[in-house]
């Protein structure tokens, strides 16, 4: 794999990649929070782009979906894969056939029966090219018949080259709806983790048929199967969820003590912090960056490591970024230590590789292969002064000495967290190369769709891992991957 050709600039990661920053009301008295255990209000992000499990690709939407839907399997508090809607599962000796046995008494939130046939429908729905599920290839690309079911899309245009037929996907529910059998084209050691991923949740065919895309935006049509169900949705304000009285699954109902769970839909960290301090919210994800030094060490302030990487996407449909020397220059001009420890106040760790520490084989086979492809050293060294000189030399070799003749770049980002301070740092960093960078601030509701559609030049990006395997990050650069925002297209890479 020619990783140096990837259309991304790796910025910072932690255990590896980034840190989850937030506050919980554990240190407050009940009188202060004005809440009871039966009612909890949390802030984990703004209005979600979508709450259709097949279409979501954002962390905040994913955090909501795990309360509203339950896949075949779930991940317990100890990070173990356990039964969800399936009470047990078996894998054939060759690792290809996975058989899931459903729990008894499964129901949808509207009280109707839920069976393995609903999972078959959900899996096959992902092959619909018109649906354009960004995660489809990631979660079922290894299932036998996937490419044929999709119509064998052209890698350049995405158009089918054969007649799509969802029934060619080798996923089949038994006649009684009690078992689901999935046959893989090749063994996938982490398929159990995929079976616990929100994208592979069942969806209700009746409500989708009756309401089309609108099924996932109104409480009255939002039929789900998780511990909670939506009772009220005021866009850009709040989503109120009530306990699902029909829930049967992997979680112990007796331990689900919160009757009402409200998602406060805020992106502005100052507004989130104010909501927390007033007792309106009992848990928030976003706090103002300037407050972090004074909050550090307090009982209700938490900084926890997560697996993921913060990076920059360069749109390879833009001719300027098709030159690998330009990409190299823009990459090496970033002082990762300064970004992680000063701009991001120590909540991130510097990233000198795309796949960070904590990921299986990140510091073993993956790093060894990366060094072997680059003369025995990593592509990005820790000596920033040397990196900057190498960046200037690369830009000159590309035909832009001291940035002469290089076009102005527009960098797109939303405004949450450290995104704007980072963008402002990049402006200064690229000035050292003689390059002008403009910042385009985009509302969150438009940001990810715009980036996915390729309507940008450079854009902030990031990936929080869905499962602990380097493939989860590397596959983002397959030309057919729905999350390939940089539009990287390399037949050799696709074939690897």
Language-model segments: residues:
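Append "and occasionally in soluble cytosolic enzymes with long acidic Gly/Pro-rich linkers
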Residues: 242, 322-428, 487
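Surface-exposed binding/hinge segments that line
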Residues: 120, 132-206
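Periplasmic binding protein-like
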Residues: 42, 111, 411, 428-478, ...
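Aromatic- and charge-enriched surface segment that lines or borders ligand/interaction sites
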Residues: 87-139, 181, 320-322
């Amino acid at each position: 794999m020619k990783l140096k050709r990837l259309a991304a600039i790796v910025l910072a990661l932690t255990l590896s990649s980034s840190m989850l920053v937030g506050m919980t009301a554990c240190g407050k008295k009940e009188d202060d929070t004005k809440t009871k255990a039966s009612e909890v209000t949390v802030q984990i992000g703004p209005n979600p782009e979508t709450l259709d499990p097949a279409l979501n690709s954002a962390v905040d939407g994913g955090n909501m979906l795990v309360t509203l839907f339950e896949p075949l399997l779930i991940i317990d508090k100890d990070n173990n894969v356990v039964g969800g809607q399936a009470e047990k599962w078996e894998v054939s000796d060759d690792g290809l056939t996975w058989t899931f046995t459903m729990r008894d008494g499964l129901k949808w939130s509207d009280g109707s029966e839920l069976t393995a046939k609903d999972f078959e429908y959900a899996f096959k729905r992902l092959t619909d090219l018109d649906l354009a599920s960004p995660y489809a290839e990631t979660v079922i690309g290894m299932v036998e018949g996937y490419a044929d079911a999709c119509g064998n899309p052209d890698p350049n245009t995405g158009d089918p080259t054969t007649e799509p037929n969802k029934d060619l996907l080798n996923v089949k529910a038994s006649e009684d709806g009690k078992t689901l059998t999935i046959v893989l084209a090749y063994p996938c050691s982490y398929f159990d983790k995929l079976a616990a991923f929100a994208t592979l949740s069942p969806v209700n065919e009746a409500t989708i048929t009756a309401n089309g895309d609108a099924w996932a935006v109104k409480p009255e049509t939002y039929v789900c199967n998780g511990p909670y169900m939506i009772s009220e949705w005021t866009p850009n304000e709040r989503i109120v969820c009530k306990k699902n009285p029909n829930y049967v699954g992997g979680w112990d109902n007796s331990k689900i003590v919160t009757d009402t769970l409200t998602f406060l839909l805020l992106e502005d960290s100052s507004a989130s912090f104010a909501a927390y301090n007033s007792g309106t919210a009992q848990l928030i994800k976003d706090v103002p960056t300037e407050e972090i030094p004074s909050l550090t060490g307090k009982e209700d302030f938490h900084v926890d490591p997560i697996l993921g990487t913060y990076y920059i996407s360069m749109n390879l449909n833009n001719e300027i970024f098709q030159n690998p020397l330009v990409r190299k220059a823009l990459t090496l001009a970033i002082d990762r230590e300064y970004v992680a420890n000063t701009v991001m106040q120590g909540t991130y760790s510097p990233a000198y590789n795309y796949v960070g520490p904590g990921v299986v084989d990140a510091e073993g086979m993956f790093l060894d292969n990366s060094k072997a492809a680059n003369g025995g050293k990593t592509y990005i060294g820790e000596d920033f002064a040397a990196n900057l000189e190498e960046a200037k030399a690369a830009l000159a070799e590309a035909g832009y000495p001291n940035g002469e003749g290089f076009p102005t770049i527009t960098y797109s980002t939303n405004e949450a967290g450290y995104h704007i301070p980072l963008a402002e740092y990049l402006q200064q960093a690229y000035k050292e190369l003689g390059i002008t960078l403009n910042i385009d601030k985009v509302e969150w509701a438009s940001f990810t769709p715009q980036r996915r559609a390729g309507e940008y030049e450079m854009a902030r990006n990031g990936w929080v891992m869905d499962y602990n395997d380097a493939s989860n990050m590397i596959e983002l650069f397959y030309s057919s991957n729905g999350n390939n925002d940089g539009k990287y297209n390399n037949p050799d890479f696709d074939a690897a």
